[in-house]
Amino acid sequence: MAERFSTFHDFALAQLDDIYTEEEIDETLKFSIIELNSGVFINDGKGSFKFKKLSSLAQLAPGYGIIAQDFDGDNITDLLLAQNFHWPQVETGRMSGSMSLLLKGNGDASFDTVWPHESGIIVPDDAKSACMTDFNGDSLPDIVISSNDGPVRGFSMTNDKNIKNCVISL
């Protein structure tokens, strides 16, 4: 590329056929997208996987940070999605219809949506990653969600039924 473009500005303004020759384009691998839904792959135990689409609410925005964890203590894996995409290419527009989402596992490879106001996990930002930790030392898993050009948010789990939600923004 350095031989074809002397500045980043020239490269940014170039069309595809300015960047690559027809021969280079013909030799490239071409991919197609056949599934745009967010979902999970379920292992059938026989060496194959089946794709299962997540709920409609999970489709409102792409999920970037995903945690598979038993959040409610029922020994069934739940999912947490850190969602939104505020800065796609201009032609596509923002994909920011979510607050991030908790999906409660049912044990049969299906998940029920837990609304953000019920879970207490509300992240209206351009969320990009999620991880589990125990930042308060109580042996319960806590959640940390970071956002592109935004705050890092911590969500503290509790066994106290009198405490509805606890959020720590850093």
Language-model-detected regions and their locations in the chain:
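Beta-propeller-forming repeat regions
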Residues: 1-170
